[in-house]
Amino acid sequence: MGVYHGNDLKKPTGGKKRPHQKVKRKYWMGRYPTFTRLDNRDVRVHIRVRGGNYKIRLKRAAYANVIDPETNTARKVRILRVVETPANPHYARANIIVKGTIIETELGKAVVTSRPGQDGVINAVLIEKRSERPAG
């Protein structure tokens, strides 16, 4: 079932309300959000979209491409946990990853800069390096 992204087809104010003249259009349809979750492996789904193109959705994520701004290098590292999600506090508890989510990786804390449900990949920028524990 599709999600309707059009307007309500009626005049909000002014004058007598009459039956609407517009009909719903297929190009107003949307889809449910992906809700990319943290898992032990990556799971991607290919979805056909308008125009015959394909969109890759990341359903489950284990790895992220993290850029270290100090050294200007990128590495594919494992995601350890979801720390915080400014978009919705409940997302962090449910381990849902969206753009802006702060994740804990093997390198340290990073903020997600890509849209996993739209791009099919998690890109992030390192904001706090992980402190090394002294051995002994």
Swiss-Prot record:
Single Gene Ontology MF annotation: structural constituent of ribosome
One BP term from GO: translation
Alphabetical keyword list: Ribonucleoprotein, Ribosomal protein
Region of interest called Disordered, as start-end residue ranges on this chain: 1-23
GO cellular component entries: ribonucleoprotein complex; ribosome
Alphabetical list of Pfam families matching this protein: Ribosomal_S8e (PF01201)
Composition bias, Basic residues: 13-23
Listed HAMAP family: Ribosomal_eS8
Subunit structure: Part of the 30S ribosomal subunit.
Recorded family membership: Belongs to the eukaryotic ribosomal protein eS8 family.
NCBIfam families given in the database record: eS8
Protein name: Small ribosomal subunit protein eS8
Gene name as annotated: rps8e
